[in-house]
A protein has these predicted regions:
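Loop/turn-to-beta-strand initiation segments
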Residues: 91-95, 120-126
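A short hydrophobic beta-strand->loop->alpha-helix junction that borders the nucleotide-binding pocket
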Residues: 22-24, 64-69
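Flexible beta-alpha connector loops of hexameric P-loop NTPases
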Residues: 69-75, 101, 145
Length: 269
């Protein structure tokens, strides 16, 4: 666990009945809120769930709502399903956790609004999102909002160096603004990142992994943004627009093939 994540989780002890936790992608919102949810439901049930995955928690007081595996969105049926859970009279608090607000369509929010208004007073409805703008005003006005701030680049740099991570200055700077790369399960991405400079100089992309390509695009955008005020500002802005479109296509349900993505990325080198 990152030190800044540990500090936030340990110091957040008061939960409002309806809360949206939000922050930028670099704030790692879902991972942080997952930990908060484990903390809350452990307190309610007087059991220790900290070492369990959320979908392994078998508690009558907890309901996890997220898109099914392989799906991009939470269905209307899924959103309506917690109605009995939310309206059942019980002496204990209950928790409905919507793991990613980005997985709810606009029409789905109407169903969520109705469900939330029918919920008992002892129900916690917790939503996590990396894009507060994706949440309709009708929901925002009814929920307490808590921002999860990104760690400062200096904090991330100190942590990375303490972990023995060292690379060229540009890569280290990129990592300092994208601390998620330092998570244990992203070792493959971290290893690939060290080779991004050579791929750029050779104008040849070796990666065949979609997440690596997505990170490579982020790295190119990061480098281009540092040059938008220079003599090649116009070209850099055009390349940033193209790279953002590639990133969007990589992450869309009907995403680009790896080979086409690599061709488009190469044109931006």
């Amino acid at each position: 666990m990152f030190p800044w994540t540990k500090s936030f989780v340990e110091n957040h002890n008061k939960f409002e009945p309806k809360t949206i936790f939000f922050g930028s992608e670099g704030a790692n919102v879902v991972a942080v809120v997952d930990l908060l949810i484990k903390k809350l439901i452990s307190q309610i049930d007087e059991k220790d769930y900290h070492n369990l995955a959320l979908d392994q928690i078998a508690s009558p007081n907890f309901y996890l709502l997220k898109a099914d595996e392989g799906k991009s969105f939470i269905t209307m049926d899924q959103l309506r399903a917690p109605k009995d859970f939310l309206t059942l009279n019980t002496s204990k608090n209950r928790v409905l956790y919507i793991q990613s607000a980005e997985q709810i369509r606009i029409d789905g929010y109407n169903a969520l609004l109705k469900v939330s208004e029918e919920a008992n007073e002892n129900i916690y409805i917790i939503i996590a999102t990396s894009n507060l703008n994706a949440v309709p005003a009708t929901i925002l006005s009814r929920f307490h909002k808590v921002k999860i701030a990104k760690p400062s680049p200096e904090e991330v740099m100190i942590y990375a160096k303490d972990k023995g991570i060292n690379s060229e200055q540009g890569v280290m700077e990129f990592i300092s603004y994208n601390p998620w790369i330092l998570e244990d399960h992203n070792e493959k991405i971290l290893d690939a990142l060290h080779g991004f400079g050579k791929q750029i100089s050779d104008k040849k992309i070796s990666s065949k992994d979609r997440l690596e390509l997505d990170t490579f695009v982020d790295y190119l955008i990061f480098k281009r943004k540092k040059k938008v005020n220079g003599t090649e500002a116009r070209d850099n802005l055009q390349k940033i627009l193209e790279l953002n479109d590639i990133k969007k296509s990589l992450n869309s349900p009907n995403n680009l093939s790896i080979d086409i993505a690599k061709l488009r990325i190469t044109s931006c080198l």
